[in-house]
A protein has these predicted regions:
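Extracytoplasmic beta-strand/coil segments of soluble accessory domains associated
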Residues: 61, 125, 142-181, 185
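Flexible loop and strand-edge segments within Gram-negative outer membrane beta-barrel domains
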Residues: 289-366, 372-373, 379-397
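Gram-negative outer-membrane beta-barrel transporters
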Residues: 240, 453, 555-558, 582-677, ...
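Short, acidic, small-residue-rich periplasmic hinge/interaction motif at the N-terminus
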Residues: 29, 33, 41-43, 72-76, ...
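A beta-strand signature from Gram-negative outer-membrane beta-barrel systems
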Residues: 195-240
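Membrane-embedded beta-barrel scaffold of Gram-negative outer-membrane proteins
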Residues: 241, 374-378, 382-384, 485, ...
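Short, acidic Ser/Thr/Gly-rich low-complexity loop/linker segments typical of extracellular
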Residues: 47-57
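Short acidic/polar hinge/loop motifs at secondary-structure boundaries
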Residues: 59-61, 181-210
Length: 755
């Protein structure tokens, strides 16, 4: 009897205590999309509160009194207000939060596979916003990347802070992603920049440094993650039409055309709209170029559609498709420097007719405990036919990834884990008329923890298993990073990460020719490994309503068994003319450097202004410089080939009433080292060269290049604008990749309408 009496008294006391409290409940959603925000925090000034669950709802109790209620979420404007609570009261608070578009609160996902403020990341990350892509009328993503500090693209080959040189179209150390899924070709791991839907990009995130622990083999030097746009509560439709003309080169002797000037023309369309629980984003693009290179052209058409259906607040499914057809010719090297810089050497021009497609089904599910389960899949078909079947190539890549993520709200930690599998099948005479298959399986784990609300620690590992043509290899890679918030907008970071890259099918087994030059296989090629480390500080600043981050960093990268396509003399190949390209393990390398950058946006007074500026210095060397490496390089000193030691990037844009004016300035120092066989005579003490005039051109152009672009737009009204865009404004004759000139001055007229 006493036991039951005690239970009754205890129950009455609980009821009495509860009755002395107030209950706060509600729903937090996105102001634009109306979607529930998972993990938003709702707290009172007495330190009671809760985080929203998988459906955006929350509930907690608080003693009676007058308090300040604060609602916050990463990347959104914080809301605070006074609230008066009485005993036994039930208060329902349904709030919407607006995204904070200021650069100081930019949110990224690539560094940790979950949303995190840019300043809190432990690695260097730069972000390209949609407005820069739209306003510059860049037709390929690599054109936009050239504006970013520390990033260089040499004839389609991206390198970050000198992590790679020029690979002749195979074996990227920078992983290109689209919506977190790889979009490198299955056979050669080469990025197809023109395949990225420029008309449907939300933002591009660039990680500088080894990222293999999260993203695998090709992320040895960093990643570029393209995040496509989804609709908001307001439907949006855009049309762009443009037409441009190339001017005569400054050296008029190089002009091969008469009155029929080379030109570009194109149009794009994008539409994004919500239909209840269904999201639709779609776009299309057509492009036609008669090139400034003689007999060269590029025609392509692309269409894409992204869908998402929210079955309920816990489960979303979707299907994304991007497809492109193209016909083009490609330029390899010039015919001479007197009047042939824009004319291909006989037999080197190649015709291509291709079809590319990605098909991406996905599922995103939150279980009852708020854990996220994500399944990503991709089919990437890349079919390329050439004028001769000996260089045609048909490859298909199948990719799948399962991600699991758990937030530990009570200890401010996030656990991310996943398994990955991919399979590639290649049918091509390009690889000795043999069918090749390759596979990759991996598991990864990352743990992020915040201490004292200021110190972020991130650690992770990945175990990779690769196989190609019967060769199997497995290896673990690790990463560790820290970020300390020293003041409101002052972040100090340090990171270390390992990298690993397995050879591609192209690097090991390619067997073809370009005119008289061979491209030779190397079945004995071995994997390269490495690591990169960085220490940096990111300082936020405000001038009136203009916001910016100033970033200062120092970095070091080391690679073992670095793979590079090397041009040289290969008598063991058993061909009549044994000059050509072969992928070799060139040894151990080290790259030291530093970088300072400023990225800002906002208003100076009443003038909206954006700024991207940066200077990068690298010192790329062999760890052990021997006579063989010296013989393969055009430089006598210890320096890696195809790098710029100094680069400066600058892009600024301001809007004054109805006029928007922008300017881009890029500086590249002289490329000090290229393949020796490119510049040395075939027969010593003669004037017979494989690439005619390259050494003379390098002798005459050895001070670096400064390139200026300019754009002016007239804003007719809120929906219409007309732009004039001039690239290479000073009409400089220059070359980024040896033996291939860049474009002379181009003037483009663009009409854009937003409905």
């Amino acid at each position: 009897m006493k036991r039951y009496l005690l239970l009754l008294v205890f129950a009455l006391l609980c009821q009495l205590i509860q009755a002395q409290n107030a209950v706060i409940t509600g729903l937090i959603t996105d102001a634009d999309t109306q979607e529930p925000l998972i993990g938003a925090t709702v707290f009172l000034s007495n330190q009671t509160g809760a985080a929203t669950g998988i459906d955006g709802t929350f509930e907690f109790e608080s003693p009676a009194g007058t308090f300040t209620l604060t609602i916050s979420y990463v990347g959104y404007l914080k809301q605070s207000r006074e609230i008066i609570l009485t005993v036994g009261q039930v208060v329902e608070i349904n709030n919407t939060l607006e995204q904070d578009n200021g650069i100081l609160n930019t949110v990224v996902v690539s560094g940790s596979k979950f949303e995190k403020k840019l300043g809190e990341e432990t690695v260097s990350i730069d972000v390209i916003k949609q407005t820069l892509i739209n306003n510059t009328n860049d037709v390929k993503l690599d054109q936009t990347l050239q504006r970013m500090p520390g990033v260089c693209v040499i004839d389609g080959q991206a390198n970050i802070r000198g992590g790679s040189g020029y690979s002749f179209g195979a074996g990227s150390r920078v992983l290109l992603l689209m919506d977190d899924l790889p979009v490198l070709t299955g056979d050669a791991a080469f990025p197809s920049w023109d395949f990225i839907p420029m008309e449907n990009i939300e933002q591009v995130e660039i990680i500088k440094g080894a990222s293999s622990a999260l993203y695998g083999s090709s992320a040895l030097n960093g990643i570029i993650n393209v995040r496509t746009a989804y609709p908001t509560s307001t439907p949006e439709t855009r049309f762009n039409f443009f037409n441009g003309m190339y001017f005569s080169p400054r050296d008029t002797a190089q002009k091969w055309w008469d009155d029929d000037f080379p030109f570009t023309a194109g149009a794009s369309f994008a539409h994004r709209q919500k239909f209840g629980r269904f999201d639709l984003s779609t776009g299309a693009y057509v492009y036609n170029q008669n090139s400034y290179f003689k007999d060269m052209y590029n025609r392509r058409g692309r269409a894409n559609i992204n869908t998402r259906y929210r079955i309920n607040n816990n489960l979303a499914v979707g299907l994304n498709v991007n497809a492109q057809v193209n016909r083009s010719t490609s330029f390899f090297f010039w015919s001479g420097i007197d009047s042939g810089l824009y004319i291909p050497f006989d037999g080197t021009a190649a015709f291509n007719q291709g079809f590319k497609i990605t098909v991406d089904p996905y599922f995103n599910y939150y279980d009852k405990k708020g854990n996220r389960h994500k399944l990503l899949m991709r089919y990437y078909g890349n079919h390329n036919a050439t004028a001769t079947t000996a260089q045609s190539n048909f490859n298909d890549l199948y990719y799948g990834e399962y991600q699991y993520q758990k937030h530990f709200e009570n200890i401010a930690a996030v656990l991310s884990a996943g398994v990955v599998g991919s399979f590639t099948k290649v049918v091509a005479e390009l690889y000795g008329d043999t069918t090749f298959t390759s596979g990759n399986e991996a598991a990864y784990l990352q743990f992020d923890k915040k201490f004292f609300d200021k110190l972020n620690i991130s650690s992770g590992m990945r175990y990779e298993f690769n196989q190609i043509a019967g060769l199997k290899e497995s290896r673990p890679v690790f990463r560790l990073g820290a970020n300390y918030q020293a003041a409101e907008y002052t972040y100090i970071r340090a990171s270390w990460g390992q990298g690993y890259r397995f050879p591609t099918i192209a690097e090991k087994y390619i067997s073809t020719s370009i005119s008289l030059l061979g491209v030779f296989p190397n079945p004995d090629l071995t994997s390269e490994t490495g690591w990169s480390s960085e220490i940096g500080i990111k300082q936020g600043m405000k001038i009136s309503s203009w916001q910016a981050f100033i970033d200062l960093s120092g970095f070091i990268s080391e690679y073992n068994n670095m793979m590079e396509f090397t041009f040289g003399y290969y008598p063991d190949e058993g061909v009549f003319f044994p000059y050509g390209f072969k992928s070799l393990n060139i040894g151990a390398t080290r790259i030291l450097g530093g970088e300072i950058s400023v990225i800002g946006e906002g208003k100076f007074g009443t003038i909206p202004t954006t700024l991207i500026a940066g200077y990068t210095y690298i010192d790329p060397k062999f760890q052990d410089f021997d006579s063989l490496q010296n013989a393969l390089s055009s430089a006598d000193e210890n320096i890696l080939k195809y790098r710029f030691k100094h680069t400066i990037k600058f892009d600024a844009e301001s809007t004054i009433k109805k006029l928007r004016i922008g300017v881009t300035v890029n500086y590249y120092s002289f490329m000090e080292a290229v393949d020796a066989a490119f510049v040395d005579p075939i027969i010593p003490n003669t004037t017979i060269y494989i690439v005619p005039g390259l050494q003379q051109y390098r002798d005459e152009h050895n001070t670096g290049d400064c390139i200026v672009d300019m754009r002016v737009a007239f804003l007719v009204n809120k929906t219409n604008e007309i732009s004039l865009i001039c690239t290479n404004l000073l009409n400089r004759d220059y070359s980024i990749r040896p033996a291939m000139m860049e474009a002379p001055r181009n003037l483009t007229v663009r009409y854009a309408v937003k409905l």
